[in-house]
């Protein structure tokens, strides 16, 4: 991911040096288990731990690996050679009985686990901001729109409550996907443990609080990674849904809410008046990326026989970029919603703009329930006057009052056009969330 869209945590997490630190953690964990079983000298493991703590792998080590790999054309071989040069004779026990993918896949799971943890925290923060705004605007009336057209009154807080509920489901998916990669694979070249005991894998997994992969070939099955990418892609659609709503609400014709606009900020190089929804447009773009990463992740599932490396080049891009994109976009949207500028007066004005058309269903029910009219006849009266209101701009209540076929009295019309009728169950909805 380019630096422009990297959070500080993701930049460190997906650095080359940190990748090699994860590789070393796998190697040392395996070595520790092997030492317990007398397969390698315990003092070799102890010495390597001491040296790695005193001289941790850094950017210089990553550059050293790159230089060796330019000759070997094999990253794990370059890694183990660089370890030997850095830590000395004891490093010869590194990689004992393992194959490259044992280290790469298990270490990649360490990085994915940490990345998913960061994203889950980000989403929890976004959810809390939605809860805060839902509470603040619980009783702020706004017109609900279906197909982009005014439908019926609702409250602005219900939008946030809907988003909060969706984020709860996202969190469930993210947690499940994170668990799917909390597995250790140390099973050898084709998954038969030919040169390493299954006990080593099991003990490493237990020491991390993870599980040993029950069966593998040379790689972990890529449906696990696809599930991670799917959870991130679905999160992206949630972020996009929220972002698109804010973009629509900021339109000049609507202007019910808008992104924060900082002091000194400019909206256009040529039009000084512009305040564009650039932050939520940015989030929309990340959602598109996340769906694209998923498509590639699904392609990676079907590998040849016990493995090929067609997935490798793709994963080196999509896993860091997908997790980085999800984290960045979530944090960006969190900032937008936290500092969202809301215009309740404009919301009321927009509610009134169509001259009461948003109350048409209440009138329909009054004719059916209170006056005993057949639905078709009642619908005809309301629709005829509603269409006239669309065409002339006259208020629906005034048109109905003047319609000789309308049996509703002034008091009954007042009741039908009562805004609070539409909002009377808002408290019940909030109660489902303990609010």
UniProtKB/Swiss-Prot annotation:
Protein's recorded name: Adenylosuccinate lyase
Gene3D superfamilies for this protein: Fumarase/aspartase (C-terminal domain), Fumarase/aspartase (Central domain), Fumarase/aspartase (N-terminal domain)
GO MF annotation list: (S)-2-(5-amino-1-(5-phospho-D-ribosyl)imidazole-4-carboxamido) succinate lyase (fumarate-forming) activity; N6-(1,2-dicarboxyethyl)AMP AMP-lyase (fumarate-forming) activity
GO biological process: 'de novo' AMP biosynthetic process; 'de novo' IMP biosynthetic process
UniProt family annotation: Belongs to the lyase 1 family. Adenylosuccinate lyase subfamily.
One Pfam family cited in the UniProt record for this chain: ADSL_C
PANTHER family found in the cross-reference section: ADENYLOSUCCINATE LYASE (PTHR43172:SF1)
Reported function: Catalyzes two reactions in de novo purine nucleotide biosynthesis. Catalyzes the breakdown of 5-aminoimidazole- (N-succinylocarboxamide) ribotide (SAICAR or 2-[5-amino-1-(5-phospho-beta-D-ribosyl)imidazole-4-carboxamido]succinate) to 5-aminoimidazole-4-carboxamide ribotide (AICAR or 5-amino-1-(5-phospho-beta-D-ribosyl)imidazole-4-carboxamide) and fumarate, and of adenylosuccinate (ADS or N(6)-(1,2-dicarboxyethyl)-AMP) to adenosine monophosphate (AMP) and fumarate.
Keyword field: Lyase, Purine biosynthesis
Example of a GO cellular component annotation carried by this entry: cytosol
Reaction(s) the record says it catalyses: N(6)-(1,2-dicarboxyethyl)-AMP = fumarate + AMP; (2S)-2-[5-amino-1-(5-phospho-beta-D-ribosyl)imidazole-4-carboxamido]succinate = 5-amino-1-(5-phospho-beta-D-ribosyl)imidazole-4-carboxamide + fumarate
Source organism, top-level taxon: Bacteria
Lyase listed as a keyword: yes
Keyword Ubl conjugation belongs to the record: no
Binding, N(6)-(1,2-dicarboxyethyl)-AMP: 4-5, 73-75, 99-100, 218, 269, 274-276, 282, 313-317
Listed InterPro entries: AdenyloSucc_lyase_C (IPR019468), Fumarase/histidase_N (IPR024083), Fumarate_lyase_CS (IPR020557), Fumarate_lyase_fam (IPR000362), Fumarate_lyase_N (IPR022761), L-Aspartase-like (IPR008948), Pur_lyase (IPR004769)
Enzyme class, first EC level, given as a word: lyase
Active site: 147 (proton donor/acceptor), 268 (proton donor/acceptor)
Pathway: Purine metabolism; AMP biosynthesis via de novo pathway; AMP from IMP: step 2/2; Purine metabolism; IMP biosynthesis via de novo pathway; 5-amino-1-(5-phospho-D-ribosyl)imidazole-4-carboxamide from 5-amino-1-(5-phospho-D-ribosyl)imidazole-4-carboxylate: step 2/2
Subunit structure: Homotetramer. Residues from neighboring subunits contribute catalytic and substrate-binding residues to each active site.
EC number: 4.3.2.2
SUPFAM superfamilies hit by this protein: L-aspartase-like (SSF48557)
